Amino acid sequence: MPLLPVALLVVLLCLPAAPHAAAAEDDPTPTPWPPQFHAKLLMDYHGNLSLADLWYDWPRGRNLHVIRYQLAADAPYYDAEWNNGTSFFYTPARRTCRSAAVGVGILRPDWLVPGSVYLGRRDAGGFDCHVWAKADFITYYEDVRTKRPVKWVFYTGRIAYVMSFEVGAVLEDAEWQAPEYCFTKDGGLPDPDLSRGHDESFIPRSVL
């Protein structure tokens, strides 16, 4: 059930800016993420709706998405990512879990700055936003006044609307621990419905 991250777009950090993408001197620069934050997201993936809590903790090298799909009896679904390149995807209600060694860590706070292309100012639901695109992977909307993220549009068609953004919020350490069945020999039960509403928007890709 791969989703956001979380390691998210890390491979993009290594991409140099193309010559045509060099920002003009008067173009604004994306605001780096704060080292720690909590964002509530409304996700729309081709009509499949979900709510997500995104916990970003750069100092501790971890990123967590807690996702609740519309009217899902087995919510929530967890996507925990670590800076050592390990991710865990699990649904406690089903006791399902799988892990992935993606080989890269979580996004750096300034992940959007190198290689992004400024697209200008646009309205996003009543918010006046600066807009950047990066590597045909994401279009990023940032509020001009507050410099906080407003909307993310991924290459898969997934749209994340940022409903709240708490700078400095930190989740308790116990909430980051993957359940014990993630570490058993079979890694938990196989999930019969891995594809429901998921895409790879938040999973780093080796080739872009």
What is each PLM-predicted segment?
Residues 90-92, 122, 175:
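Residue-level signal for mature regions of secreted extracellular proteins and peptides
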Residues 50-110, 138-140, 149-164:
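An acidic-aromatic
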Residues 2-62, 94-95, 174-208:
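N-terminal leader/targeting segments and the immediate start of mature chains
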Residues 40-46, 68, 135, 155, ...:
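A structural detector for beta-sheet-dominated domains
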Residues 125-188:
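Gly/Pro-enriched, hydrophobic low-complexity segments
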Residues 31-42, 59-66, 124-133, 145-151:
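Short, hydrophobic/aromatic-rich segments at coil-to-beta transitions
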Residues 47-49, 113-115, 125, 133-135:
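Short solvent-exposed loop/turn micro-motifs enriched in small/polar/acidic residues
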Residues 105-123, 164-165, 170:
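Short acidic, Pro/Gly- and aromatic-enriched capping/linker segments at domain boundaries
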